[in-house]
Regions:
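Zn2+-dependent metallopeptidase catalytic core
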Residues: 1-123, 127-134, 138, 145, ...
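Secretory-pathway/luminal and periplasmic proteins that interact with or process carbohydrate-rich
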Residues: 83-89, 149-155, 215-219
Length: 255
């Protein structure tokens, strides 16, 4: 007697989503499993399928940035905040692969690169391994990781101009204990752009920031990467910002 068996797949405990989780597929190695809110219809399903197809590229890029091998993650594509253009952002519960591996990303109909970028933003935070979480430093690093793996698909999320328009306050020698302030995040975005323009790689920056941990500032990062006195970071950066011919009008003003 034969009987067809349907494998039961437990629904992940999403941080915010409470609707139906439609299974879309998993990568061959089982590292990434993708779901979608069926209410999104064909455009949402297309987003999820395109994310699944791109997932291993994103994971490989993220692993290279942090010099580590990440863990398995679940992702659901849905309309965060009711948005279907990616502007709802992304979310997860923690900056690790144990309790933060259920990731929510906003649908972006017709713009798969935006969905992949949102995935990387959260995946990078998992790779920070409980460091930099909820801080301006970690938020800037997360956004740079997303930008670097998606050809800046989230350009409209730029915060460095907010920093410039608010008097360019110093968040190089101090850390803002929030990831919700566009001014402090923007300072970090511009500072990382500056370090990249000096020849340092995003991998060097990311790995040193994780090593420095929550107490690390961008000034201490500068000191570790250059061998120079960390006290020189802010004045040198500030002088170079002042000398920018076009000012700060993107997250990569030195690029």
């Amino acid at each position: 007697m034969s009987q067809s068996l349907k494998t039961h797949r437990p629904v992940p405990n999403w941080p915010g989503f409470r609707g139906t989780s439609q299974f879309v597929g998993a990568t061959p190695d089982g590292i990434v499993t993708v779901y979608v809110d069926p209410k999104l219809g064909p455009p949402g399903l297309a987003n999820a399928q395109e994310l699944l197809a791109d997932a291993l590229r994103v994971v490989a890029a993220n692993n290279a940035i942090f010099g580590t091998t990440g863990g398995a993650v679940n992702i659901i594509v849905y309309a965060l905040g009711g948005a279907t253009d990616g502007t709802g952002g992304a979310d997860h519960a923690a900056c690790n692969y144990q309790t933060g591996n259920n990731i929510e990303v906003c649908a972006a109909f017709g713009s798969p690169a935006r969905v992949s970028a949102l995935f990387e933003a959260e995946l990078s935070e998992c790779s920070m391994n409980e460091q930099l979480c909820g801080l301006s430093t970690g938020e800037a690093l997360s956004r740079w990781c997303a930008s670097s793996t998606s050809n800046n698909a989230l350009a409209d999320f730029a915060t460095a101009p907010d920093w410039a328009q608010n008097g360019e306050p110093d968040f190089v020698t101090k850390v803002d204990p929030t990831d919700q302030n566009p001014v402090s995040t923007g300072c970090g975005m511009a500072f990382i752009s500056w370090l990249l323009s000096k020849g340092h790689t995003l991998a060097q920056i990311a790995q040193q920031m994780v090593t420095d941990g929550d107490a690390g500032t961008f000034a201490t990062l500068y000191g570790a990467l250059t061998g120079d006195n960390p006290a020189n970071a802010w004045p040198e950066f500030s002088n170079d910002v002042t000398a920018l011919p076009g000012g700060v009008n993107s997250d990569n003003p030195f690029g």
